[in-house]
Amino acid sequence: MVNRFNRLTSKEWLPFQKSWFKYESDTKLYSDNLRFFCKAEPSEEKVLYFGRNFDLVSSIGKELKIDVTTEDQYDGPLQFALIDLRETIQGIKDLSEYIVLRDQVISLLGKVYRHMIHRRFVCILMPNLQLENQYLPLAWDMAMQISSMYSLKDEKIGCLNLQDENQVESTRKDVFYSLYFRKDENSTGIYSPHVHNLLNSAQDKKIESQRELTNHVPAWFILKPAPRKKNEILHPAKYPEELVLMFIEKFTDKDANILDPMSGTGSTQVASLKSGRNAYGTELSSYFAEIATKRCSELIDPQAPELFANKVANNFVILNKDARLISSADFPEIDYMITSPPYWDMLNMKGAENQAKRIEKGLQTNYSESDDDLGNISDYNYFLNDLIEVYFNLLNCMKPGSFLTIVVKNIKKKGRNYPFAWDLASGLMQKVHILPEVFWCQDDINLAPYGYGNTFVSNTFHQYCLTFQKPN
């Protein structure tokens, strides 16, 4: 296949498609983006740069035979726009300063829209921001606002290498976003404000607990879980016990009550019991509820004691029940909730590569065929609103000041990007406080050459671990 999009070989194309990367230097960051998003042959079409490192970007452009210009100097067609807000964001002292910056970016992108070549990209580099005890997901807001003008196509997470992994302060300067937008048949260039709760609730809600609870959860981590056992492989979307263990040990003490309302094969409950916590949950599928119960029972009362290092003394209850119907009468008061919901109806996408592999092995490809299954709702907004209501109801079962962690990712479906993680956070922030996000970065999956030679489509190898606090 001929590459008409950029100047990379097929071997060079693949690494850029990974949705997270270890940041090495600004030089490499800029160079990688210019090489990927600029045309294969030298062109009179320029690159617009907005930021504090014009001299560096311009010098890289000269080496690549790309003409880099600024907002004051550009004229004629543009093949790429690179907007670097990282340093500017880190210097912001309050929300009003960000609004001024956001308006400046919106104005700039409105002006350059007619100069952008059709189906070419805009990249915005920026972090979210911690201000004292308020967390502001500014990158999510910026993406939502710009998506009314340009099509939101993708994101990559820049992960900064840490000198001492034991001295991590979640997110502040440890990760940043590379947000990618495209001028195409679905964009208009006309700004329309996107209404959400990401910044409104941040203005008057503050985290009420001691910050050290989150200071030791890394902003990003690579997890290589143990191979799934036979009965665990049966579930199409299991998350690893190692991940659960990392969070419950940071957010709870021994004998705490842990809840997962969408238990699957019992990863949360098994990790909780092994770490000396009480484990509770519900599971809509009787099939998976039975597997989860059996796994927990083996820990409490092992049939082959010689295979288990220690017999578990804590309690567990797993109900075969719709999470929508959970009440405070079902379980003791909950100290912490960790869960991973369905990623909309993505498991019903029959053409997905992972689905094809499971079908070939005779494994189940979705959670269930039940009409009550959230994963079978086809309308995105209905699905999102139902899920938010599930979590709002579960707050009634949780102690004041307790935490909940939700493992999710943004979704690409039929050429469109649905910011599921951001939309879910926005909905929940009507009633809970958000903490800095944590990224589970996957490094053990083969890359696929999506869009090769035509456009940019990343391989989504990062998941959001979103943590919230119930107000006191």
Please give the residue ranges for each predicted region.
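Class I S-adenosyl-L-methionine-dependent methyltransferase catalytic core
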Residues: 1-472
